[in-house]
Design a protein with these regions (language model features):
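Conserved G1/Walker A P-loop phosphate-binding module
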Residues: 1-76, 81
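Canonical P-loop GTPase G-domain recognition
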Residues: 3-12, 147-180
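Residue-level recognition of specific faces of alpha-helices
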Residues: 25, 61-64, 95, 108-111, ...
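Adenylate-forming
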Residues: 39, 181-182
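Conserved C-terminal guanine-recognition region of P-loop GTPase G domains, centered on the G4
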Residues: 98-166
Length: 182
């Protein structure tokens, strides 16, 4: 698909700020600093549409990006080790759960996992939650350029087994802004 237009539609701190849309949405989820924003930029062939940072926890709102006026990509706050108070992390968790459970137009979730570390307990918990709520999911293994080809292939198999996936996760590299073919 050729991306003709892409822009920030809304940044929501609460469910009352979610845009009232009927178009399909794809959400991007994962721990803090795993590469959610980088993956979205890569898929859209944009370098700076979605703000990225080397500091975990920079995405603090649910950001809705309108693509070609026909669908939205949704950047969720990361979970895990962001250096913010526990109350704020809990409010993010509730906001994410509200979004994932209430959006009728949510067509799927891209779960992003750092290939070097594999799934965390929170990744497994989110995967179980998505399975239970019958939300379609695609797993992407980020930071694949940090490993050799052989180690990358081995890690993909481990992630597949650990998460009980039907197919291998898709490896992604931020260096060449693309999905890697193994």
């Amino acid at each position: 698909m050729k991306i003709k237009s892409a822009g920030l539609l809304e940044s929501a701190a609460g469910a009352n700020q979610f845009p009232d849309l009927v178009m399909p949405e794809i959400a991007f989820a994962g721990r803090s600093n795993v590469g959610k924003s980088t993956l979205i930029n890569s898929l859209l062939n944009r370098k700076k549409l979605v703000k990225t940072s080397s500091t975990p926890g920079k995405t603090r709102l649910i950001n809705f990006f309108l693509i070609n006026e026909i669908f939205c990509l949704v950047d969720l706050p990361g979970y895990g080790f962001a250096k913010v108070p526990a109350e704020m992390q809990e409010s993010w968790r509730k906001l994410i759960e509200t979004y994932l459970s209430r959006r009728d137009n949510l067509r799927g979730v891209v779960l992003i996992i750092d290939i070097r570390h594999g799934p965390t307990a929170q990744d497994r918990q989110l995967k179980s939650w998505l399975d239970f709520h019958q939300r379609p999911m695609l797993v992407v293994a980020s930071k694949s350029d940090k490993l050799s080809r052989g180690k990358c292939a081995s890690q993909l198999q481990k992630i597949k087994k650990d998460l009980e996936l039907a197919q291998l996760p898709l490896p992604h590299s931020s260096l060449n802004l693309s999905l890697i073919h193994i």
